[in-house]
Amino acid sequence: MKILHTADWHVGKVLKNQPRIDEQKLVLRDLVRVANDEDVDLVVVAGDLFETAAPNPQAQALVMHTLMALREGNRQVVALAGNHDNQKLVQEVYAPVLGQLGIHVIGTPRRPDSGGTLTLDTRTGERAIVAALPFLSHRYAVRAAEALLHDQSQHNQDYANKMRGIIELLCRGFTADSVNLVTTHATLLGGRWGGGERAVQTLLGYEVPPDVFPASTHYAALGHLHRYQEIGGPCPIAYSGSPIALDFGEEANQPVALIVHATPDSRAHIRPVPLTGGRSLATLRGTLDEVVAAGAEAGEAFLRVILTQKASAGLADQVREKLPNTLDVQIDEKFRARTDSTVTRSRIGRTPTDLFADFLAEREVEDPRLGAMFAELLEDST
């Protein structure tokens, strides 16, 4: 069986006021091309279809059309909700509508007999059993454990054990003569965030160990971390990463789709296939003259410029005039006057999440976990 694994599309992403939708149209068109060229039997989209919980019509249309294009040729398609997605919208609107076209969409955790475990017969006659678990926050993990496991004693266990129990339940239908797959949107211990090579450290107990996946799993298709990577465990495990570099912390990432070959009696083989269409990102650091000189080598990349000189009137405008692809101009902290704060951005029309992202960017904090934590705390408080 040939499987295409992708995740973290984040359709509707806006980077420093620059919409990425045109790039996303190109890269998702390329993703469909890969599915066709590779003649895959099954496509798995492991969460974060959208950038926000309230995607605009253009973003929704792109996701819908891409999923339908992937379905062409009678290939099976499975798509999950991630932490950026509106899970109720995905479950109550997209799942029934796209389900009429044979596309399997899972927005909220389901019991095995209600869509949590899918038995899919491919066009080649092979059978896949897919245990599908959308993103689970702490507060929903307790609720999901109660609904799926019917065990009140589970409520006091930590997040990882709740995930383990739910995944074990969803995998009970695995058989010896099927290709057994797990797909979820989660953070595994040992994974690396898209913005650097740091080992993921425990943060609010969200990480789960790779051994939550049973050894009978032929392949675990993950979403949430934006860098392509394989994780050691009892079965082949991989993150496909995002098909475009979403932020400047991810500028070194190489966008790919994963082609996975799996049979009931062999270990899955994973092969990354490069995706095109997204513009690269680059950070230039130096004086005005230095970054302008370096910009000649940056091509069409979107730029973040960090100036190692004192601020002066019109400096940012000079940068943008000489480097039109510049999205962000900062003064290196060493050159900022003690009384000088970073440029105040207008709050009109900007969400608290946007303002917090600006706050992190101004301090060169590149850790997507903080943004996710802020968004969850904001949701809990409103």
Language model features by range: what are they?
Residues 37, 42, 261-382:
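Accessory, non-catalytic peripheral segments of nucleic-acid enzymes
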Residues 1-68, 72-75, 372, 376-382:
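N-terminal active-site segment of His-dependent metallophosphoesterases
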Residues 14-16, 49-66, 81-101, 106-107, ...:
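Metal-dependent catalytic neighborhoods of phosphoester/phosphodiester hydrolases
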Residues 99, 188-266:
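Conserved beta-sheet core of the metallophosphoesterase superfamily
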